[in-house]
């Protein structure tokens, strides 16, 4: 388990937040049932490295004022122009209790239906997973190699983990292969809708 060191914040002015960020640190907050809300700041490079190495759903040891907490990142705010993390939320977790988190789906393989001219549709990109913190997967892999035209991949088809469960209906669609003509018809309908103009009131 990776360990990060954070400092407790007592100054909440805008100038203080600006100074934290310009010094290469990220303001954040650590919260939990028995912890309350505790504003903190931590090294930006170390945070990015930890998330890259461990994954966003990893359990991290966050040390604040000599006290260690098992936490997970629940929210990251970023500046898209500077590509920087501007704020981070850390939730204290009980390692023996189940929690629910969003886990991304990663489709693997090339579907037979796509090779035959079909079009891959993926309506679901993340799953709500329930598990103890250490058992949460970083991604859920779904093999679509055998998926043919007019076939669907549902929650029931995903590999079940003995240590976690999905908080979804079993028939919820993860991916499907549309016939080429169905995709073309949908595109034509969209074009016709865009080109349609309402009739003028004074038109003879």
Swiss-Prot record:
Induction of its expression: By heat shock, salt stress, oxidative stress, glucose limitation and oxygen limitation.
Keyword DNA-binding: no
Disulfide bonds: none
Disruption phenotype: Cells sporulate poorly at 48 degrees Celsius.
GO-annotated molecular function: 5S rRNA binding; structural constituent of ribosome
Region (Disordered): 177-204
Positions with biased composition (Acidic residues): 186-204
Record's keyword terms, sorted: Ribonucleoprotein, Ribosomal protein, RNA-binding, rRNA-binding, Stress response
Matching Gene3D superfamilies: Ribosomal protein L25, beta domain, Ribosomal Protein L25, Chain P
Coiled coil regions in record: none
Single GO BP term: translation
InterPro entries: Rbsml_bL25/Gln-tRNA_synth_N, Ribosomal_bL25/Gln-tRNA_synth, Ribosomal_bL25_b-dom, Ribosomal_bL25_C, Ribosomal_bL25_long, Ribosomal_L25_dom, Ribosomal_uL5_bac-type
GO cellular component labels: cytosolic large ribosomal subunit
Keyword Nucleotide-binding: no
Similarity annotation: Belongs to the bacterial ribosomal protein bL25 family. CTC subfamily.
Chain's role: Not required for exponential growth; probably functions in vegetatively growing cells, maybe required for accurate translation under stress conditions.
Subunit composition and interactions: Part of the ribosome (presumably the 50S subunit) under heat-stress but not control growth conditions. Binds 5S rRNA.
NCBIfam families: bL25_bact_ctc (TIGR00731), PRK05618.2-4 (NF004133)
Protein name in the entry: General stress protein Ctc
Organism: Bacillus subtilis (strain 168)
Gene name linked to the record: ctc
């Amino acid at each position: 388990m990776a360990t990060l060191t954070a400092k407790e914040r007592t100054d909440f002015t805008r100038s203080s937040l600006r100074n934290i960020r310009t010094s290469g640190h990220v303001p954040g907050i650590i919260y939990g049932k028995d912890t309350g809300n505790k504003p903190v700041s931590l090294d930006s490079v170390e945070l990015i490295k930890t998330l890259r190495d461990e994954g966003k759903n990893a359990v991290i040891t966050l040390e604040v004022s000599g006290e260690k907490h098992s936490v997970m990142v629940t929210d990251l705010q970023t500046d898209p122009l500077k590509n920087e993390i501007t704020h981070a939320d850390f939730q204290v977790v009980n390692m023996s209790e189940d929690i629910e988190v969003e886990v991304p789906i990663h489709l693997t393989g090339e579907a037979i239906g796509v090779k035959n001219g079909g079009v891959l549709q993926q309506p679901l990109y993340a799953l709500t997973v329930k598990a103890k913190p250490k058992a949460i997967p970083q991604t859920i892999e779904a093999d679509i190699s055998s998926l043919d035209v007019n076939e669907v991949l549902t929650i029931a088809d995903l590999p079940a983990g003995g240590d976690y469960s999905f908080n979804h209906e079993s028939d919820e669609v993860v991916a499907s292969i549309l016939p080429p003509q169905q995709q073309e018809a949908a595109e034509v309908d969209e074009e016709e809708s865009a080109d349609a103009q309402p009739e003028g009131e004074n038109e003879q």
